[in-house]
Amino acid sequence: MNKLIAIVGPNASGKSHIAVDLASALGGEIISADSRQVYRGMDLGSGKTPVSERKNVPHHLLDVVDAGEFFSMADFQKLAYEAADDILSRGKIPFLVGGTGLYVDSVTKGYLLSDVEPDLKYRDELEKLTTPELYDMLMEKVPDAAVDRFNRNRVMRMLEKLHDGDDIVPTASPRYDVLTIGIYREREELKRRIDERLTRREAEGMLEEVRGLREQGVSDEFLLKLGLEYRYITEYLTGVWSSEEEMLNELALAIKRFAKRQMTWFKRDQSIVWLNMNDKPFETALTLIKNFLEAE
């Protein structure tokens, strides 16, 4: 079975940077597993690794569709499989890197996904509920679901998948033999890094990025449904928040809550090898990967 390396962790943990270093050292290529990085023009808000920091490591599944277009987990899985198989065919190592738990699991666990038409009657019932009501409904079924409470589209899709069974998605035999490395920080350090990253991205033009998307015709509805940075900034630009400072403070709190939920989601998987970034884990991770690749 072909082998794949997954690097996961919460927002601001440093997983993308260590993944670039590892891929660079091992001749690998990175497949982004982030539900917002697939959109063109959504760079700062989604946290794409700048080209200048990619060390010439090829990155896949960035800028796949225009902002505003529909993109499903099934779309992601299909493209991720294609990218991984292409990387392997060229004798390279695929690194699946990201914090969107369902996207990661769809590849590493081999979810059975299809483009079957949704149950429109059930969808109509869901549409009648507010976003908080939908989120509470999901939490009753899957308390550790790593999803932004304001991302209405994703919450609804997860509820639809739960409608006909007990699991979010059925699992087939995985396509790849996978080593998953989890990257984490101590809680207070992660919170500090989230604050610093948000301040840096705001200074780099994150608000202007969202303004530009709106000027290009990307709907407020779409931006609001994406949650976190895009939701809060869109709310600020439409007068929901009284000041930029208030908005950024509330956004920072929301990102911290989401990072906690990401950790809860990933910690369900007992196969993940966790490494603390404070321990400078590059050499440890490199050894783990080399041993995994060399094993029969």
Over which residues does each language-model region extend?
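Phosphate/pyrophosphate-binding catalytic cores of soluble transferases and nucleic-acid-acting enzymes
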Residues: M1-E296
